[in-house]
Amino acid sequence: MTDNPIIWQPDTERLKKTSMYCFMKEQSFDCYDDLYQWSIDQTADFWNALCDFCDVRFSIPANKALIQPGDMTTAKWFSGSELSFAEHLLRHSGDRAAIVFRGENGARSELSFDELRQAVADIAQGLRSAGVMKNDRVVGYLPNCPEAIIAMLATASIGAIWSSCSPDFGINGVVDRFGQIKPKVLFCADGYFYNGKCHDSLKAVRGLLANIDSIEYTVIVPFTGQEFEATDIRNTMHWQDFAEQGAMLEFTQVEFDHPLYIMYSSGTTGIPKCIVHGVGGTLLQHLKEHVLHLDISSVDRLFYFTTCGWMMWNWLVSGLASGATIILYDGSPFFSSDTILWKMAEEEKLTVFG
């Protein structure tokens, strides 16, 4: 067999500007294979070096990067350390765009890093006033919109645990997931758009509340721009009313392995199984993938086609930690044209498209 031709290869000048090249040089490696071998032979040294390279900030440093490295089931990472996931995703500031939202109906909006930081502070204070504390669960039944990211970061900032589903999930599918984790607060939208149609979400929300009695507050995002009636939904608050304007941004420091996200298996063999992802592991793994493997930085505009019900949403949002502008798209990828995402890529000057 003949080797397939190389489609593209970076020149030496471009290669030397990448984060991977700089990281290898810092660790005195000239060959990627040697770097890889070191990363699996000296695992603790590799992850310590990555923390330094990516400026991971521990409020309490670890006693040791890795304890009992030979056994995956008993290994303990960065024991004794504390940090904040939200603090790392919100460490950038200024008027540069943090989030750009695009909808299939042509809607477009932007949030700067400063605006994002303030919005997270306001919602976090609303959560505190609602009695949400460390270890409580907060859930989102939301379109792929900026409010979903704000609610997640606000949740993480106080040490609570986030879980989300896309609004195209049916009532039973959402109850099977959220019902297992006993959430205290539900963030939802009045509806969403898909393939040119506006779909009501509040009927499903009523069904969720009838089946999940742990939910104490329901916060509604007015996503569709249409008037809605929700007086019959218990303890309902409008997004703007729930946010406590002018709050200070604070970050609760938590253990490295403190739960950050609850995600789910597909549910094809029974009720979906809960999968917990920790604060430190999620942050480090995403930084490794973004910074080393994709060379993402503050000059990038990062997009991945996803919904809030897929793990790639969580992966996309972590691009904020590298200072990238993340692009959200909600709706059908083929509405009005089968090239709608490519047109968006051109208009938004995307540098990473997934």
Describe the function of each predicted region.
Residues 124, 137, 143-171, 181-186, ...:
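A short helix-loop-beta submotif of the ANL/AMP-binding
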Residues 157-240, 349, 354:
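Structural core segment of the AMP-binding/adenylate-forming
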Residues 19-21, 25-27, 86-115, 225-230:
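AMP-dependent adenylate-forming
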Residues 142-143, 163-179, 191-193, 197-201, ...:
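ATP-dependent adenylate-forming carboxylate-activation enzymes
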Residues 281-301, 311-351:
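Conserved AMP-binding/adenylation subdomain of ANL enzymes
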